[in-house]
Amino acid sequence: MKKLEIGGLYKHYKGTKAKVLYEGFHSETREPLVIYMHLEDGVIWARPKEMFLGNVVVDGKEVERFQQIEQEILIKPSSN
């Protein structure tokens, strides 16, 4: 299984970006979970780790559900 980076940025196969906040466990099943935040709207989600790091089939091609991306430096241009 691929390694998960806490604090890492990931791009969902549909194009949204997310930041991994924590790794946790389901309280009843002890299934490993990934807690992450969508950068576009700030909503926090939990997904099974195996699913987060797994693949999906899109147009007959297998792709990563979340692909790790480089940190982006976002600088707001000055209004001078």
Outline where the language-model segments fall:
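Mixed-charge, low-complexity intrinsically disordered regions
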Residues: 1-80
